[in-house]
Curated annotation (Swiss-Prot):
ATP binds at G170, D171, R172, Q173, T174, G175, K176, T177. PANTHER family: ATP SYNTHASE SUBUNIT ALPHA, MITOCHONDRIAL. Produces ATP from ADP in the presence of a proton gradient across the membrane. The alpha chain is a regulatory subunit. One of its GO terms (cellular component) is plasma membrane-derived thylakoid membrane. The record marks S363 as: Required for activity. The gene is atpA. It is a peripheral membrane protein. One of its GO terms (molecular function) is ADP binding. This is ATP synthase subunit alpha. F-type ATPases have 2 components, CF(1) - the catalytic core - and CF(0) - the membrane proton channel. CF(1) has five subunits: alpha(3), beta(3), gamma(1), delta(1), epsilon(1). CF(0) has four main subunits: a(1), b(1), b'(1) and c(9-12).
Length: 505
């Protein structure tokens, strides 16, 4: 028989008491009252913050948006098919974040940073809040460096600077995305990190864009954030903020970044859907009252930082789709008032064969002229005016039968300028080529060339400069100026190419 000694028992109990550590865990828990249409109403969650992430029993994450007296309205970031009435919900104590780092470059991610390209996990170095405050006035510098798009019509007449917000607006199928993609392609070798945010687009369209970027080597400096049409409205609403957070990571490291939001109309529609389901009062066009703030807080994050903060920049190119050219609708007017200018694409011009279909009359850049390179500023001053006058005269000439010689000359010049600015997709021009093309048109050096030969003249001139006058390209590209020596070289090249074109006609 084993004898039990009381002192042994007491020492064991004492030992266990010493080892016991009281770990009190307080959790903020609620109960699902109702779920459906991507919205959950939750009872409890007394301590929840606005915008805080909440976790449901089945692992689905949501964001608490409506904090009411007796319940919390949360939007789901997944299907949420297994969430049941009466199941528990936990508050996480975190606001939505995205993992960021250099490893994101070249990848396709969801608005929450999950990889979508099948290339494995992303080794992120830190997390950034998806919504973060915009830089203040002291933290900024005025826009003074050019962001070349490679599209002659834009760089000559509607120049964009680093840190600017320039809206691309137009009807569907007018080439809005094409301009954005061309701008990304033109950043090759410029040490600019590009972020392309696809909101509510077809997965096939996004796949095509990624393929174009990969083929032309642009994916090496681009991050794609995709919230496709099949994704919940919550992810489509978050996608632009996630793109801005990724760009901010690089901007605060002193890099130049370019963000394209394609397009913010779909984000506004996703937000309207969420707001109506949350029973928020509808306003104009059934959008909620804070839809202006939705876009302003996003676009204000674009900035050119002061030298004290590293001098990085974030240039934003938001895209807005209009209905039948109506720029006075609610969302277009909101975004026009927030941005520093707009590039308006017209379906009439597009259908008439002018690509890119930029309506020069109502397109404007409010701050970009300060950033325009001297070479193109020197020669493109009159270009916008001449094209605007040509549009007026062309409308008038339809009714007038006999026109005086000066008017005929002006119409002829305008037609040739129009042809000069035509540019095929995915073929951005370098600065020296743009200078050459605009110079030839503005100085009247192609007035004798037939209109149908102008496109041939442009391609001939580009190849001639590359092969026979490389010193002109070198001079303009390095100094960003058109001095007398470079101008003399350019005149020779234009005369030579013109002679060849006229001889062949």
């Amino acid at each position: 028989m084993v004898s039990i000694r009381p002192d042994e028992i007491s020492s064991i109990i004492r030992q266990q008491i010493e080892q016991y550590s009281q770990d009190v865990k307080v959790e903020n828990v609620g109960t699902v009252l109702q779920v459906g249409d991507g919205i959950a109403r939750i009872y409890g969650l007394q301590q929840v913050m606005s915008g805080e992430l909440v976790e449901f029993e089945d692992g689905t994450t949501g964001i608490a948006l409506n904090l009411e007296e007796d319940n919390v309205g949360a939007v789901l970031m997944g299907e949420g098919r297994n969430i049941q009435e009466g199941s528990t919900v936990k508050a996480t104590g975190k606001i939505a974040q995205i993992p960021v780092g250099d490893a994101l470059v070249g990848r396709v991610v969801s608005p929450l940073g999950a990889p979508l390209d099948g290339k494995g996990e992303i080794a992120a170095t830190e997390n950034r809040l998806i919504e973060s405050p915009a830089p203040g006035i002291i933290a900024r510098r005025s826009v003074h460096e050019p962001m070349q798009t490679g599209i002659t019509a834009i760089d000559a007449m509607i120049p964009i600077g680093r840190g600017q917000r320039e809206l691309i607006i137009g009807d569907r199928q007018t080439g809005k995305t094409a301009i954005a993609i061309d701008t990304i392609l033109n950043q090759k070798g410029e040490d600019v990190i590009c972020v392309y945010v696809a909101i509510g687009q077809k997965a096939s369209s996004v796949a095509n864009i990624i393929e174009v970027l990969r083929e032309r080597g642009a994916l090496d400096y681009t991050v794609v954030v995709a919230a496709n049409a099949s994704e919940p409205a919550t992810l489509q609403y978050l996608a632009p903020y996630a793109g801005a957070a990724i760009a901010e990571y690089f901007m605060y490291k002193g890099k130049a970044t370019l963000v394209i939001y394609d397009d913010l109309t779909k984000q506004a529609q996703a937000y309207r859907q969420m707001s109506l389901l949350l029973r928020r009062p509808p306003g104009r066009e059934a959008y909620p009252g804070d839809v202006f703030y939705l876009h302003s807080r996003l676009l204000e994050r674009a900035a050119k930082l002061s030298d004290a903060l590293g001098g990085g920049s974030m240039t934003a190119l938001p895209v807005i789709e209009t209905q039948a050219g109506d720029v006075s609708a609610y969302i277009p007017t909101n975004v026009i008032s927030i941005t520093d200018g707009q590039i308006f694409l017209s379906s009439d011009l597009f259908n008439s064969g002018l690509r890119p279909a930029i309506n020069v009359g109502i397109s404007v850049s409010r701050v970009g002229s300060a950033a325009q390179t001297k070479a193109i500023k020197k020669i493109a001053g009159t270009l916008k005016l001449e094209l605007a006058q040509f549009d007026e005269l062309a409308a008038f000439a339809q009714f007038a039968s006999d026109l005086d010689k000066a008017t005929q000359n002006q119409l002829a010049r305008g037609q040739r300028l129009r042809e000069l600015l035509k540019q095929p997709q995915f073929s951005p021009l370098i600065l020296a080529e743009q200078v050459a093309v605009v110079y030839a048109g503005v100085k009247g050096l192609i007035d004798e060339i037939p209109v149908n030969q102008v496109t041939a003249f442009v391609s001939e001139l580009r190849s001639y400069l590359k092969t026979s006058k490389p010193e002109f390209i070198e001079k303009v590209q390095s100094s960003k100026q058109l001095d007398d020596a470079a101008e003399a070289l350019l005149k020779e090249a234009i005369a030579e190419v013109k002679k060849n074109i006229l001889a062949a006609v």
